[in-house]
């Protein structure tokens, strides 16, 4: 029985609908660093790549961003790509762009056909989020609505409410990442993920961050999280597990759940 909801790209299931999907981040500061990182990661065959463009030093030059996005596409061996600008309020790097400039960059990249998913934060102004929804529809990309709290883990009902709000706002996928202060908070995140399956139809991506939170990256999919983020070469968030280690643990858990 499937425990997660599958992600699709242009009508095709990502990685044939396997669960969970493994996503590796690209966090290089310049073109050479991103492409070196990409070469290492592609050899490890994750199911998804996420380009964290807020780490990229050339972010203010839209043409450079688009060209690098195209090069990532050419060199990604067919692995679908998530395009993400993480804001400083949700743990990202400072970039010196207005939100209108960020959306202009998103438009240029999405219209280039170089990416499959757009990650955009629910905490953005409603008019900006509406533009992201419209862009995803226009370009046949999928919109991941995201929420990150690097300070705490909200209660179950608040996390579920965020996920419901993402669906209501027009997202295709709902993502939450929160910081635990103890093991109880990891349980809170897992419970919220399970509860969300009853409330919304979207695929959910959820994770607890930090050392405690690494547990959620290993077995969060059992509770309904469709994607686990792993380290390909460099981590983009605290608590990420190396791809090889994550894959090993997943194989053991999957065999156990099948009674093997």
UniProtKB/Swiss-Prot annotation:
3-dehydroquinate binds at residues 50-52, 86, 217, 236, 240. Keywords: Amino-acid biosynthesis, Aromatic amino acid biosynthesis, Lyase, Schiff base. InterPro entries: Aldolase_TIM, DHquinase_I, Type-I_3-dehydroquinase. It holds the Pfam family DHquinase_I. Pathway: Metabolic intermediate biosynthesis; chorismate biosynthesis; chorismate from D-erythrose 4-phosphate and phosphoenolpyruvate: step 3/7. Its EC number is 4.2.1.10. One of its GO terms (molecular function) is 3-dehydroquinate dehydratase activity. Belongs to the type-I 3-dehydroquinase family. Homodimer. This is 3-dehydroquinate dehydratase. The gene is aroD.
